[in-house]
Amino acid sequence: MNINTSPDQIIRSSAQVTPGYMSGFGNSFETEALPGALPIGRNSPQRCAYGLYAEQLSGSPFTAPRGTNERSWLYRIRPSVKHSGRFEKADAGLWRSAPCHEYDLPIAQMRWDPTPVPKEEVTFVQGVQTMTTAGDVNTQAGMAAHVYLITKSMVDQHFYNADGELMFVLQQGNLRLVTEFGRIDAEPGEIVVIPRGVKFRVEIPNGPARGYLCENYGGAFTLPERGPIGANCLANARDFLTPVANYEDKDTPTELFVKWGGSLFKTTLPHSPIDVVAWHGNYAPYKYDLRTFSPVGAIGFDHPDPSIFTVLTSPSETAGTANIDFVIFPERWMVADNTFRPPWYHMNIMSEFMGLIYGVYDAKPQGFVPGGMSLHNCMLPHGPDRDAFEHASNGELKPVKLTGTMAFMFETRYPQRVTAHAANASTLQDDYADCWKGLEKRFDPNRP
């Protein structure tokens, strides 16, 4: 190339045009569904190929530091101003946003059985049920923990969330998320993250689906620092998958739902908004298989802090204090010598919302089942139940592999307030605290 060569004259192989995914976390990706749809050497040419419109989607302020600056350039059939109309308020159902003070419940440790999947037809937008909220959606701080129940695919319906990014934690049933950036297929054991402002619809290819949904009002999820662990283990960047471009050119009416300022709005469009033919950038949806997480732990003695199981973190303005940590408890070996191996008894400045995707959780072998949930708020004590304590205190300390298990936690610096729905749910275990009743006084000053 000489100094007179324009970027459009550069010969190169086209960006990825085959169906599938691109590997990596936070990469600057590029992909096109039609050869040559992606401009070379510039973002906003005078005329885009194929008559497309160039549009930037910013996930951070323009002046954010390079390491946290997120944006993507989309080359679409219509600009997003054509994916808008006269909005009207829509029924949000059981979807709530922080601050939510609709129920004043005495402080307590709480646990719920799985929420039954309804028999009636329910789409994703209709099927979100909020369990807890924390922080304030209007200050972009905090989170909400939801359950989603889906028995019907969204057909000629789309949605985007202006209040935060969404993390789907699949528990039962597969999902297909058709997004502006491409298509994501996921199964239980995987998570999908949809950034703030990205349009999508949810389909269920194999029947009803249930799972957990974290709505992150704060900074985008990112990989945690590994510190002395080094360059490997935990969630490795190469295992995150971002979809390749895949567009629709459909001139059929569709409803667009938007969550904004804690409320739900809707409008009708004459066409599908899934019309991005090519894109490049680092602000995009992705999925991750939790079974590829490489855990680290104690190989001598003692039980390390659960932060070593952090998959993703949403940082706050205070170093080391997360807006949200997404933590999992996967299959792993327990080998510590002369050690109480389950999670220890604990009072925590952070607030913990837990769920179980499959298997048995070692600290609660009874009562905490797949699809269930628990809440241990700021400075409320929690820990193993009596059976877990007795087994761990008296069992033979040989190496044990915990298999077929996957629990998770949404941990936040903000107290989590339960919604009226969660407080009055028939699945709430009124006797949850009884799991610790059998813990007897064992103190004997005459027996060291």
Swiss-Prot record:
GO terms for biological process: L-phenylalanine catabolic process; tyrosine catabolic process. Its EC number is 1.13.11.5. Keywords: Dioxygenase, Iron, Metal-binding, Oxidoreductase, Phenylalanine catabolism, Tyrosine catabolism. Pfam families: HgmA_C, HgmA_N. InterPro entries: HgmA_C, HgmA_N, Homogentis_dOase, Homogentis_dOase_bac, RmlC-like_jellyroll, RmlC_Cupin_sf. Its cofactor is Fe cation. It catalyses: homogentisate + O2 = 4-maleylacetoacetate + H(+). GO terms for molecular function: homogentisate 1,2-dioxygenase activity; iron ion binding. Fe cation binds at residues 346, 352, 382. The active site is at residue 303. Transmembrane segments: none annotated. Homogentisate binds at residues 361, 382. Pathway: Amino-acid degradation; L-phenylalanine degradation; acetoacetate and fumarate from L-phenylalanine: step 4/6. It is an enzyme of class 1 (oxidoreductase). Belongs to the homogentisate dioxygenase family. Hexamer; dimer of trimers. Involved in the catabolism of homogentisate (2,5-dihydroxyphenylacetate or 2,5-OH-PhAc), a central intermediate in the degradation of phenylalanine and tyrosine. Catalyzes the oxidative ring cleavage of the aromatic ring of homogentisate to yield maleylacetoacetate. NCBIfam families: hmgA. HAMAP family: Homogentis_dioxygen. This is Homogentisate 1,2-dioxygenase.
